[in-house]
Amino acid sequence: MKLQEALRKVIRQFGGSVIQEKRLMSFLADYKAFDDYPAVKEVMRAIATGDWGKELCRLATDASDADYLRYAESLKETLVRERNFKQEFADYAVDSISLAIGVSSQVTVTEPGDHGYEAVRKNTGEQGSRSAQEKGSAQGG
């Protein structure tokens, strides 16, 4: 499930304040929200366990959309500058939260794969095995 979809479900069930709680990570893991982009898990953990999640929740309820979006943009920059997360992952996490909270329909979530980062491929059981033709080629035959 996409991160923003999982966030919407969790927020619908537990309210927007769940963004600032450690248990958010367990809920998102249950929905397999990190399967496509495992690195986003660390970005979300930083947001949920720090003051950033609290501030996003506060601004979502007490501020204008413009103020929220200004903070969201500065948060993305902070995550990259201070925590050394890749810009694409910081953008994906913060934009997914913004969309899920319902602050603004103007938010567009761009997946990291749209910037050249491929989603993680699932193990199909064939990983690590080579065909007979490949084995023969490798052995010079």
Question: Which role does the model predict for each range below?
Answer:
Residues T110-R130:
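Intrinsically disordered, low-complexity regulatory segments in eukaryotic proteins
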